[in-house]
Swiss-Prot record:
This is Small ribosomal subunit protein uS12. GO terms for cellular component: small ribosomal subunit. It comes from Geobacillus kaustophilus (strain HTA426). Disulfide bonds: none annotated. Belongs to the universal ribosomal protein uS12 family. Residues 33-55 are annotated as: Disordered. It comes from the Bacteria. GO terms for molecular function: rRNA binding; structural constituent of ribosome; tRNA binding. GO terms for biological process: translation.
């Protein structure tokens, strides 16, 4: 434990908090052509590649992902949630933070039902998370 004199000479160091979704903390000034420190909850981007990858060790599947170039110039890998999707190269998507635990390097999710990403078809529960509209009541 330090003495009071040691603390006066050299105080406690603050912990540096590292962001879990750093691409959302950068903006882009197109006039100055430089990045800015403007954070946002979501960002828009264009898909440069859409594909599947296999998860880490205990799991087995083909998880869908898209490589997205954001409006701030950063290119990230984002997960496409839900069953089936309509995304292809040059699709405009909205991404949010949130990693996929069994896919290394995937720190973002694509928001379904926004911009070019269609909602999940025939989804009844948890619809708001997948951009699915409320189904019409069946006529008697």
């Amino acid at each position: 434990m330090p003495t009071i004199n040691q603390l006066v000479r050299k105080g406690r160091e603050k912990k540096v908090v590292k962001s879990k979704s750093p691409a959302l903390n950068k903006g882009y000034n197109s006039f100055k052509k430089e990045q800015t420190n403007v954070s946002s909850p979501q960002k828009r981007g264009v898909c440069t590649r859409v594909g599947t990858m296999t998860p880490k060790k205990p799991n087995s599947a083909l998880r869908k992902y898209a490589r997205v170039r954001l409006t701030n110039g950063i290119e990230v890998t984002a997960y496409i949630p839900g069953i089936g999707h309509n995304l292809q190269e040059h699709s405009v998507v909205l991404i949010r933070g949130g990693r996929v635990k069994d896919l290394p390097g995937v720190r973002y999710h694509i928001i379904r039902g926004a911009l070019d990403a269609a909602g999940v078809a025939n989804r009844m529960q948890g619809r708001s998370k997948y951009g699915a509209k409320k189904p019409k009541a069946a006529k008697k």
